[in-house]
Amino acid sequence: MMTRLTCDVVKALGDKTLSVAESCTGGMIGAAITSVPGSSKVFKGGVISYTNEVKSSLLGVSKDLLAREGAVSLPVAQEMAVGVRAATGSDYGLSVTGLAGPGGDEYGNSVGTVFVGYADENGFFARKFLFDGDRESVRLKAVNAALQMLMENL
């Protein structure tokens, strides 16, 4: 899964470190990063937080926030990025939460809705993306969007 973008991200990290928190991508970002030779110098690790329980217990995402906004939301993506950065002591935290299919959620999100979160020493933010395609296509597009967003902020 090594791509030009993934290689560029690893190179751009330099002496900084990255950790990821993934939901709908199920470890695909971590797999992409670790496919690059030398990535062990910059990649600390990842959490596949597929359930709300893991988002809360391992990443510190507020249970109230999860109940109020749903797992697929901008503030949850932000808290995931902040949480994985704090838990691992990384310079950067990157997160993805979304709906790859087959159906939407009770909060009005449709299939293809993905939020990518980013955190560093200066703060955090998240962006919403709407992707089309089947489950695998949405997941691949989410990985690419997350890596692109990271690259733009390195």
Where are these regions (language model features)?
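Short alpha-helical segments enriched in small residues
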Residues: 1-154
